[in-house]
């Protein structure tokens, strides 16, 4: 299992990082070992770096998943109201893996607004106390999950 966090600001550095990761995987794991490569690659599925990785013999788990739950892309900038189709966090697998499920987990949490209790509002019964909250993202990236099985080559 390999993980990477690729430089976000320099195109040349991102391209060379992808090539270096692939080279190291070949040197260490060899051509016949099962490989799972995950990471924040800071490029979406339309970028040249993504093409370098997905044309290397590794498969994009999103593309090959039997079932997908991806209501959003993977970057949210800590704002739960942002929506994108871009995935900058990826899971790549070598031949022999079956990608049964793929998901981008968009869970969030709530924090209470100070002094934001409302007593019986609108259609709600009067005794019902409602509290205003702010929805927050726990990270600037949504986690990516894949359920894999290995069947060999």
Can you annotate each of these PLM segments?
Residues 9-26:
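Active-site beta-loop-alpha substructure in enzyme catalytic cores
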